[in-house]
Amino acid sequence: ILALSGGGYLGLYTAIVLAQIEQRLGEPLGRRFDLIAGTSVGGILAMAVAFELPLSVIVDLFKNRGEQVFSGRGLPSGTVTRLLDLTRSVTGPKYDGQVLRDELQRHFGDATLADARHALVIPAVDVTRSVTKVFKTPHVQTSRGDEDQRVVDQLRVDGWHREAERAV
């Protein structure tokens, strides 16, 4: 199982490490795992792995559009700033998301979870309603997946964007 966590722009580090591993393997990273899971930025990375989108593409997205995707906000430095940042995390999504949506649409198009090449699990939380949902590919016969869900919509639900709350 490859499990990838969130962390906003800090996900660039994980993306770089995964891209280097993928490059050294000489094949898509997803072929080495039975299940791929991720939340928030880890969800984006997990989708890339599950769909065999080269991780170098995600690294480029972070490097070229990271400031727009993450609102150009730096890391919280002081105690008060960290508390305000935590409050924003609890009361709603931190980021607007239109730039990210446009970029994801460009790479994933109208692909659905059924199009994933590898088993995938994306837990999502609607923080405004305290509702959780686990989106998944139909990788277990007894468990219905969310195969009709568009990838772009799932990544938006995954803790990032206001408009997607209704999907949870």
Task: Give the location of each predicted region.
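Patatin-like phospholipase
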Residues: 1-3, 8-104, 136-144, 153
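Surface-exposed acidic, glycine-flexible loop patches that form ligand/cofactor-binding
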Residues: 25-30, 105-120
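Contiguous domain-boundary segments centered on the initiation and propagation of an alpha-helix
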Residues: 89-91, 101-109, 148, 159, ...
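Active-site gating loop/helix substructures
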Residues: 115-168
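Generic secondary-structure signature for well-ordered alpha-helical cores
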Residues: 23, 67, 109-112, 160
